[in-house]
Amino acid sequence: MSRINKEEVKKVAQLARLELNINEINNHAEQLEKILDYIRQLEKIDTDNVPCTTRAIEVINVFRKDEKKNYDRTEELLELGPSREDKYFKVPKIMNE
């Protein structure tokens, strides 16, 4: 891997529409070089016996059966709203027909 130079930082900044002063260019070049050094270290790690994965931890979906439950405090909840009509909250219209 090649080293990051100031011209490459300027080019990336231009593509990203960033205006960087000389101090920022130098700082970003140094930071990017440190990142690339870290990547170079990672490239040296032997991963031949490591199984491929997309996550660090296993993701398990937990499914449950949907069950209808009666709720006996509907009236109490409707009283908390600013406006209601029958057994529904009444809200301002936001879309035209």
From Swiss-Prot:
Domain of life: Bacteria
Pfam families given in the database record: GatC (PF02686)
Methyltransferase keyword on record: no
UniProt keyword Protein biosynthesis present: yes
GO biological process: glutaminyl-tRNAGln biosynthesis via transamidation; regulation of translational fidelity; translation
InterPro entries: Asp/Glu-ADT_sf_sub_c, GatC
Enzyme superclass (EC): ligase
Keywords: ATP-binding, Ligase, Nucleotide-binding, Protein biosynthesis
Enzyme nomenclature, EC number: 6.3.5.-
SUPFAM superfamilies documented for this protein: Glu-tRNAGln amidotransferase C subunit
Molecular-function annotations in GO: asparaginyl-tRNA synthase (glutamine-hydrolyzing) activity; ATP binding; glutaminyl-tRNA synthase (glutamine-hydrolyzing) activity
Catalytic activity annotation: L-glutamyl-tRNA(Gln) + L-glutamine + ATP + H2O = L-glutaminyl-tRNA(Gln) + L-glutamate + ADP + phosphate + H(+); L-aspartyl-tRNA(Asn) + L-glutamine + ATP + H2O = L-asparaginyl-tRNA(Asn) + L-glutamate + ADP + phosphate + 2 H(+)
Function recorded in the entry: Allows the formation of correctly charged Asn-tRNA(Asn) or Gln-tRNA(Gln) through the transamidation of misacylated Asp-tRNA(Asn) or Glu-tRNA(Gln) in organisms which lack either or both of asparaginyl-tRNA or glutaminyl-tRNA synthetases. The reaction takes place in the presence of glutamine and ATP through an activated phospho-Asp-tRNA(Asn) or phospho-Glu-tRNA(Gln).
NCBIfam families cross-referenced by the UniProt entry: gatC
Subunit structure, as described in the record: Heterotrimer of A, B and C subunits.
Family statement drawn from the similarity comment of this UniProt entry: Belongs to the GatC family.
Protein name: Aspartyl/glutamyl-tRNA(Asn/Gln) amidotransferase subunit C
